[in-house]
């Protein structure tokens, strides 16, 4: 108790003067083209804007004018800003899942359905309300279908990962109420290497799960304008070490009180999380023709993963707990073309498309296939980027998505179905010096067709939805380096296939899921106020947001048991979300060649569903403070993360204890070109028992215990 109190105090002590974490969009430094799909933004930094600290790779800087990754449409990104991780931060934080890789960013938590299936949670939103993309189009998997389904994007392949919010998110769909996560890689090259061959790689070892992983990629110029790309990666983990018992304290007390010896034995599971091992491999090849701003290319890749889902233990001796494993395979083909149209109304045209053949098996403990998921789909988008004239800019485009989805097996919970979706979008911007404005609109038509299915007892069903969304934003520079913003949005989201048609046992989530075919559009209003500032040696940022929902769709346990599984059912009601994010950094000293910086992050979400009380799985208040010593070749960092108790819970939820976690890292760039680095890190140094309230499995699967890691990234 004393140690937790001291550590929590340390977290607060690091925050004064930096109570707003590194609001890098307050430092309008242009984002350089890294060859990963990020196009350099216009360099419009003012003299008052603080330069980044020497050797600082903690957070990729943002610009007041950005180019949204995967899109050439420029916008001032007013509503909430873009956060990007790359370089050493990505090397240090990369994990087997996207959610765990991003969980230190402001406003970001993770669904933590075990270490292998963890999606980002943005401002309390997860699942269908967070879009996960690769280079601007969807992952084309079924990860949003259920919390146990992993995203078929390996973070090891990423050159940069961006988190987008605000009007720019409407470029990618009306469902991205929480935001968009865009993973950038170089599988379709965007530049011709200046060397005979360009090679990137990363090797990682982590002690908590005996993690062994590696990725290597090569770009080879062929002739004057052609580039060939190949990459491959492999990762393997054992069952993950944890900082205490597998069962949360309340469940463990119930297990200890049981008269059944087998149930009492569950209370003794500690130190290791059973059924959490994984093995993943991924290979890809691509090629592109590149001439100035014009390029056309394609890639093909195959992703394969076998991983365990932590066991949801039953304290009823009559019910056997399952230890499911998922076997995922996806073959994907992607294409991209960018055409510089020169002068005139249009500046450029970008075409992007992808096709995916995906399947996964949910395996019983015996190895038999319990359920099979098959998804074949394709997505295409075209963007027409306007030339900037007299401060006006922007663009417009169209997007189409099709998916055929089938579930088969003893635990089938969805009928065979198809989805067709057409989206039309536009983003317009205005730059008048101190004043900048932005407006975006999107129309989206979604059609679902579900087959009649006697197994789950539903007739043939067809639903059509027409959703219209719009967002407005304005910012004003009140002083050199300081700007305020006010933004508003109106969004409509079509329900997902699962929210409409689910009706049956789902072995992966160890629950019985029930949808509602009568669910209507989910509609919301949102407003946000921001302040960003930067000066010599500091950055500062804060935002407060409030969203009102009409017909909010949510899944919650009912307390009933069916087929020996807890029943989770989808409902619709009005709801309200509000919260804040704080971010900042300050340079406090220079000792020799080292800049000493303090930084901090704080975030909080409060969510209520009308007639039901608190929304389920909402992350509690979090504060994170760090001290970092930075030089041209060596960086050292110690940080303390304090997470509050979550006692504001939905029906049938249990409270979640808070925790205080200490992490440290040391990075070294051995060569003068600073293109390669070695990172040593120690996470959860004191081996605390930590659980995320956003996780369906938080009472059965805590976070990783002490994890000592070494990563080496090389480029030549």
Model-found features: residue ranges?
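Short acidic/polar hinge/loop motifs at secondary-structure boundaries
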Residues: 138-167
């Amino acid at each position: 108790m004393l140690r937790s109190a001291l550590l929590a105090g340390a977290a607060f002590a690091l925050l004064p003067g930096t109570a707003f974490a590194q609001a890098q969009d307050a430092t309008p430094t242009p984002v350089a083209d890294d060859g990963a799909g990020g196009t350099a933004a216009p360099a419009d930094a003012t003299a008052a804007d603080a330069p980044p600290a020497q050797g600082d790779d903690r957070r990729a800087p943002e610009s007041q004018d950005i180019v949204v990754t995967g899109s050439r449409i420029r916008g001032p990104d007013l509503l909430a800003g873009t956060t990007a991780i790359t370089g050493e931060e990505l090397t240090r934080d990369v994990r087997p899942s996207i959610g765990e890789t991003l969980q230190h960013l402001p406003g970001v938590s993770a669904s933590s359905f075990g270490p292998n299936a963890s999606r980002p949670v943005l401002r309390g939103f997860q699942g269908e309300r967070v879009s996960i993309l690769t280079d601007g189009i969807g992952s084309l998997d079924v990860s949003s279908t259920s919390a146990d389904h992993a995203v078929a994007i390996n973070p090891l392949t990423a050159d940069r990962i961006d988190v987008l919010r605000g009007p720019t998110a409407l470029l990618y769909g009306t469902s991205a109420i929480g935001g968009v996560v865009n993973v950038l890689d170089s599988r379709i090259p965007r530049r011709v290497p200046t060397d005979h061959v360009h090679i990137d790689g990363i090797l990682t070892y982590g002690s908590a799960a005996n993690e062994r992983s590696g990725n290597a990629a090569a770009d080879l110029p062929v002739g004057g304008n052609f580039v060939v790309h190949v990459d491959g990666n492999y990762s393997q983990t054992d069952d993950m070490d944890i900082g205490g018992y597998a069962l949360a304290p309340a469940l463990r007390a119930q297990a200890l009180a049981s008269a059944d010896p087998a149930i009492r034995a569950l209370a003794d599971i500690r130190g290791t999380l059973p059924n959490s091992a994984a093995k993943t491999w991924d290979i890809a090849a691509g090629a592109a023709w590149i001439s100035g701003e014009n390029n056309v290319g394609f890639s093909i890749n195959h992703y394969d993963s076998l991983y365990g889902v932590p066991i949801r233990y039953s304290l009823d001796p009559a019910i056997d707990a399952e230890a499911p494993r998922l076997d995922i395979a996806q073959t994907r083909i992607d294409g991209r073309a960018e055409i510089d149209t020169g002068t005139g109304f249009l500046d450029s045209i970008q075409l992007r498309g992808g096709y995916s053949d995906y399947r996964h098996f949910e395996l019983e403990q015996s190895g038999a296939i319990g359920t099979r998921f098959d998804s074949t789909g394709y997505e295409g988008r075209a963007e027409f980027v306007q030339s900037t004239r007299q401060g006006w800019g922007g663009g417009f485009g169209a997007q189409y998505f099709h998916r055929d989805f089938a579930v088969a097996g003893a635990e089938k919970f969805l009928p065979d179905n198809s989805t067709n979706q057409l989206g039309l979008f536009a983003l317009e911007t205005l730059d008048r010096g101190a004043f900048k404005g932005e407006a975006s609109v999107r129309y989206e038509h979604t059609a679902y067709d579900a087959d009649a299915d006697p197994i789950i007892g539903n007739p043939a069903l067809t639903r059509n939805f027409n959703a219209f969304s719009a967002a407005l934003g304005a910012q004003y520079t009140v002083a050199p380096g300081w700007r305020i913003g006010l933004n508003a949005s109106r969004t409509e989201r079509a329900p997902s296939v699962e929210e409409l048609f689910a009706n049956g046992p789902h072995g992966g989530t160890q629950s019985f899921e029930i949808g509602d075919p009568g669910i209507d559009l989910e509609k919301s209003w949102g407003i946000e106020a921001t302040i960003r500032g930067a000066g010599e040696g500091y950055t500062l940022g804060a935002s407060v947001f409030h969203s009102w929902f009409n017909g909010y769709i949510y899944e919650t346990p009912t307390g009933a048991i069916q087929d020996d599984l807890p029943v989770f059912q989808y409902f619709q009601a009005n709801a309200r979300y509000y919260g804040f994010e704080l971010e900042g950094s300050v340079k406090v000293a220079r000792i020799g060649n080292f800049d000493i910086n303090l930084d901090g992050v704080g975030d909080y979400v409060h969510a209520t569903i009308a007639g039901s009380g608190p929304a389920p799985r909402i992350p509690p208040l979090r504060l994170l403070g760090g001290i970092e010593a930075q030089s041209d070749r060596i960086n050292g960092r110690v940080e303390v993360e304090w997470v509050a108790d979550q006692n504001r819970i939905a029906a049938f939820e249990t409270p979640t204890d808070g925790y205080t976690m200490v992490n440290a890292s040391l990075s070294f760039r051995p060569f003068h070109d600073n293109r390669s680095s070695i990172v040593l890190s120690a996470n959860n140094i004191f081996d605390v028992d930590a659980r995320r309230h956003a996780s369906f499995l938080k009472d059965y699967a805590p976070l990783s215990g002490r994890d000592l890691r070494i990563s080496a990234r090389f480029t030549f």
